[in-house]
Design a protein with these regions (language model features):
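A conserved mid-protein helix/loop that constitutes part of the nucleotide-sugar donor-binding site
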Residues: 26-30, 197-216, 233-236
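Nucleotide-activated donor-binding/catalytic signature segment of Leloir-type glycosyltransferases, i.e.
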Residues: 236-254
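Acidic donor-binding loop of glycosyltransferase active sites
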Residues: 263-277, 290
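A short, well-ordered alpha-helix in the C-terminal region of glycosyltransferases
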Residues: 326, 333-348, 354-360
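Active-site proximal beta-strand in glycosyltransferases
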Residues: 92, 102-123, 130-132, 151
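Conserved acidic donor-binding segment of nucleotide-sugar-dependent glycosyltransferases
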Residues: 306-307, 311-318, 326-332
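Short hydrophobic beta-strand element within catalytic cores of glycosyltransferases
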Residues: 291-294, 304
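Membrane-proximal helix-turn-helix segments that form the acceptor-binding/catalytic region
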Residues: 129-150
């Protein structure tokens, strides 16, 4: 039997009540569907508040209770206990933080982007700050030696890895993230220009970068509306910083409605400060024919060509304000960017392209 084991901390909520909602969980769901369609038996191993078993349309889910450190080692051993001598298996570790300190045979890890490129701590002495970064980087480099392949959601990580070591024994495979492709018909846009920030309301996603920019835009332009779509600890900060304005809206939407939700807007802003792969929020906005403004952080640099399919700026209030002002005042530019954005995701970031890449990896593993 061909077995595909996926190791992740929380695919279902720890109490087993429902599936978790998030980018990695969605990734696992699509990967399980693909592997199942190729004839593999898919099993997901995770932690829980108690042992439980669940079944989805494409996978069996085994949850185990464990006190203390919830690492990948325990789940890998649970998966190995269910192998039979005549099975062919492939183990996919869904996050590189779960790689154990020993080599895992027939294994792939999914690397979701650099997560420690923080700009905080900049008041430290330069040498101390640099040493901290080395301390953060070394465990990542080291644990990549313990898997057979590393699937990277952006080329940013691959290029960073090459700067850290001259060793090329780790097989790094770029399979960039994907999005559902929205309708090709051009959106009808009339009335005020609608801008959306559809991210989790946390500082690393740019809430505190965008809030003062949004306030300035509202005081400068009468013909705009700004929507904050999501939840998170910075919600009250956003409200208090921007103040009361009838042109500001706060809402939430279901992840499976993202494309139709984004099609209500003319402009999408993705002002990440750090820790970003190939942003699903950015891809979904492009698929919905929004003109996009994003920061030059992480894997978003693999998506946007500045002034061709979006505007790319540094994580800077002045640059962000200028870019959004251009889109507010230039309808021709908005249309040009939104069309090219749609064409980009349709050709390079579709789920069909993603499935073909993963199919090759999965089938090669079982055939060899």
């Amino acid at each position: 039997m061909n077995l595909l084991d996926i190791i992740y901390v929380r695919y279902y909520k720890e109490d087993g009540s429902s599936l978790n909602i998030g980018g990695i969980e969605s990734y696992i769901t699509q990967l399980a569907k693909l592997a199942s369609s190729l004839g593999a038996k898919v099993r997901i191993f995770q932690y829980g508040t108690h042992d439980f078993f669940k079944q989805t349309d494409s996978a069996d889910v085994y949850a185990y209770f464990k006190s203390g450190n919830k690492n990948g080692d325990f789940l890998l051993k649970k998966a190995a206990q269910k192998h039979r001598h005549d099975d062919k298996w492939l183990t996919i570790i869904a996050n590189d933080t779960l790689i154990p300190n020993y080599h895992v045979s027939n294994s792939i890890v999914i690397q979701h982007g650099i997560g420690f490129d923080s700009c905080f701590g900049k008041n430290e002495p330069l040498l101390i700050n640099f040493i901290k970064r080395v301390y953060q980087a070394y465990p990542i480099i080291k644990r990549m030696q313990n898997v057979d392949k590393v699937v990277c959601v952006d080329n940013n990580f691959i290029n960073w890895y090459r700067t850290q070591t001259s060793f090329r024994d780790v097989k790094l495979i770029p399979i960039l993230n994907f999005t559902e492709i929205g309708p090709k018909e051009e959106k009808v846009s009339d009335g005020p220009i609608k801008i959306v920030f559809a991210r989790r309301f946390v500082q690393i996603r740019g809430t505190r970068l965008f809030a003062p920019v949004a306030k300035k835009l509202l005081s400068t332009y009468d013909n705009i509306e700004i929507t904050f779509a999501g939840e998170g600890p910075d919600k009250e900060y956003l409200k208090s910083t921007i103040g009361n304005d009838e042109r500001i809206n706060f809402c939430a939407y279901r992840s499976d409605e993202s494309i139709s939700f984004h099609r209500q807007f003319d402009v999408a802003v993705v002002p990440t400060i750090y820790s970003e792969g190939t942003s699903l929020s950015l891809l979904e906005a492009m698929s919905a024919q929004c003109a996009v403004v994003c920061t030059n952080v992480g894997g978003m640099t693999n998506i946007i060509l500045d002034e061709y399919n979006g505007l790319m700026v540094s994580p800077d209030e002045g640059e962000l304000f200028s870019a959004l002002s251009r889109l507010i005042t230039d309808q021709k530019l908005r249309k040009f960017l939104s069309k090219n954005a749609y064409d980009t995701v349709n050709s390079s970031f579709s789920i069909n392209k993603w499935q073909k890449s993963w199919k090759t990896i999965i089938m090669n593993n079982f055939e060899n």
